[in-house]
Amino acid sequence: MPPSIPVPSIVTRAIPSLARAASTTTKSTPSKEHHVHSYSPEVLPLGYAVASTHASIKKKTGALDLGILVSTTDKPASAAACLTRNVFKAAPVTVTTQLLQSGGGRARGFIVNSGCANAVTGKKGLEDAWEMSNTVTSQLPPGQRGIGTLVMSTGVIGQPLPISSIISKIPELVRSLDDSPKSWLDLSKSFMTTDTFPKLRAKSFRLGERLVRIAGIDKGAGMIAPSMGPPQPPHATLLGVIATDAAISPPALQSALNYAVDRSFNNITVDGDMSTNDSIICLANGAAGKLETQGRETAEGMEEITEDGHPEEYKVFREELRSFAEELAQLVVRDGEGATKFVTIRVKNAPSYETAQAVAKSIANSSLFKTAMYGEDANWGRILCAVGYTPTAQAIIPNHVSVSFIPSANVSDPTPLRLLTNGEPEANIDEDRASVILAEEDLEVEVDLGDGHEEAKVWTCDFSHEYVTINGSYRS
């Protein structure tokens, strides 16, 4: 017999203790109900009618999952869109792209469904999206049928639409169109999938001599890392629609939307996943009247604003659209799946806007950073690591970089907490003060690249235990 071989004893290594003990307590997601807003009729844009219903797309009985918005003006609205750059574009994205191209940047309205993305569904999915569009258009009054209805879908990828159920509900939707605040809020509910609250915003502003109104709806909580561009060439999910009664030409509207989206929706991330369906549609129907000296509105039509012909009004509109889109985009982050924190990443003194944006996104998409924020752990090494592997990192000078936590308005001491200065760590970081700052729901991280004058902001949330739970059972 071969000699017996002694079995070595198992050596247990002690894990060195960290500077801060990890919490094992699971935090509950804070209530988001205070983000739900309703509006008086005076704030909602003129010349639009909306409706929504249950079409048995969602499993929950009675859940709103199909909606439409129609411009009731004689002339179709100017229309612009920023759509996903994911190569697996969903059928509704393709249909919307083609409708905008064939319609010369004009549309009558849109139809949206939630619960099924109609993505990666082949020829049948494309046929279904066209049938949705064509059926809405055919049900409108004869004077409103000359141009197409855009299409948006959100939900599970790879499953077919219950198209018969959807088509059967469209006549009912068209008959129930109205412009009431309740109908607008219900329309926002028809966008929802894993969202915990409907996202509707509206406001008014002066544009030259006219009072202009704007309303927006979006949805999203997971699969959020949009990279959207104009539909030429065609490029859980982010969907959004912005409707205004301003009069602006299709090219000017597309230009303004590109600018606004790149500084709002393209600067948010929940989990770093770009959807097949991301779509932001903007409609402008020109229904706003001219203000008289007494402050009343006349029914006089508006001349469409163009970028070159009305440069000052165009800039005002573009900035109003940008700030409005930013508010809508932030709602998506605040409703991030399982999120307990809303985090602003501000990168300043960068050599270019593109560099600042790339650095901020790199931090915001870092799973290690996001879990540290959930654990309220001032682990600034994870921030610096994400800065260092940014695709544009060659433009960064390490010994120029500084990192700080910026306290929220609720913290008594507003002084920034410096963690790193010109590439050197601070010798005595106040961990107790860091804990106070990180305990707040709203957080801000500031990264100073020290090598320019450009700045970008990106908004993200933390990763919690609940995010895994939600996405581990998404289809059930």
UniProtKB/Swiss-Prot annotation:
One of its GO terms (molecular function) is L-glutamate N-acetyltransferase activity. The record marks 154-155 as: Involved in the stabilization of negative charge on the oxyanion by the formation of the oxyanion hole. InterPro entries: Arg_biosynth_ArgJ, ArgJ-like_dom_sf, ArgJ_beta_C. Pfam families: ArgJ. Keywords: Acyltransferase, Amino-acid biosynthesis, Arginine biosynthesis, Autocatalytic cleavage, Mitochondrion, Multifunctional enzyme, Transferase. Its EC number is 2.3.1.35, 2.3.1.1. The record marks 236-237 as: Cleavage. Pathway: Amino-acid biosynthesis; L-arginine biosynthesis; L-ornithine and N-acetyl-L-glutamate from L-glutamate and N(2)-acetyl-L-ornithine (cyclic): step 1/1; Amino-acid biosynthesis; L-arginine biosynthesis; N(2)-acetyl-L-ornithine from L-glutamate: step 1/4. It is found in: Mitochondrion matrix. GO terms for biological process: L-arginine biosynthetic process; ornithine biosynthetic process. Disulfide bonds: none annotated. It comes from the Eukaryota. The active site is at residue 237. It catalyses: N(2)-acetyl-L-ornithine + L-glutamate = N-acetyl-L-glutamate + L-ornithine; L-glutamate + acetyl-CoA = N-acetyl-L-glutamate + CoA + H(+). Substrate binds at residues 193, 219, 237, 337, 471, 476. Coiled coil: none annotated. GO terms for cellular component: mitochondrial matrix. Catalyzes two activities which are involved in the cyclic version of arginine biosynthesis: the synthesis of acetylglutamate from glutamate and acetyl-CoA, and of ornithine by transacetylation between acetylornithine and glutamate. Heterodimer of an alpha and a beta chain. Belongs to the ArgJ family. This protein may be expected to contain an N-terminal transit peptide but none has been predicted. PANTHER family: ARGININE BIOSYNTHESIS BIFUNCTIONAL PROTEIN ARGJ, ARGININE BIOSYNTHESIS BIFUNCTIONAL PROTEIN ARGJ, MITOCHONDRIAL. This is Arginine biosynthesis bifunctional protein ArgJ, mitochondrial. It comes from Cryptococcus neoformans var. neoformans serotype D (strain B-3501A) (Filobasidiella neoformans).
